[in-house]
Amino acid sequence: MTTVSLSLDEILDLAKKTLLANGCDEETASILADLIMKAERDGSLSHGLFRLPAYVAGLKSGKINGKARPEVKKISPSVIKVLGNNCLAPMVLNKGLPELIKAAKENGVAVLAINNSHHMAAMWPETETVAEAGLVAFACTSYKPAV
């Protein structure tokens, strides 16, 4: 088996072009390609290019809407809900995190709940975004019981 080494810029470009060619719009492709590149950069290969074929399959099947726009709803001063409209979770987080950060700074604590989105992907880049804003973050996702 031949190993091909790619630079981070090449990974970003490959991921973005692949997503664009398979149904994502520019914004969604850029957000997800950046996350894929960061996963590769940080050594989390299971959330880097490895995920690209599954994203493409979801886009082609219609399970994932690569052009959807999440809807942000403020439930209370410290609870933000984002309806994913079947887009990928990184797109949802891109729209919801600024609202979460604002609410946490105004109220001391805040929660971001998302639904109807697909695959959370790597979650540390989002918690890093919150930490860079001077806050503490805890991220979790639901999944089938494993115990």
Question: Residue spans of the language-model regions?
Answer:
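Generic N-terminal amphipathic, Lys/Arg-enriched alpha-helix
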Residues: 1-22
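Aromatic/hydrophobic pocket-lining residues that form π-stacking "cages" and hydrophobic walls in ligand
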Residues: 15, 100, 126
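N-terminal and secondary-structure boundary signal
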Residues: 20-23, 42-46
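Alpha/propeptide regions of enzymes that mature by internal proteolysis
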Residues: 37, 90-93, 97-115
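Active-site cofactor/substrate anionic-group-binding motifs, chiefly glycine-
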Residues: 48-101
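Glycine-rich anion/phosphate-binding loop at the beta-strand->alpha-helix junction
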Residues: 109-147
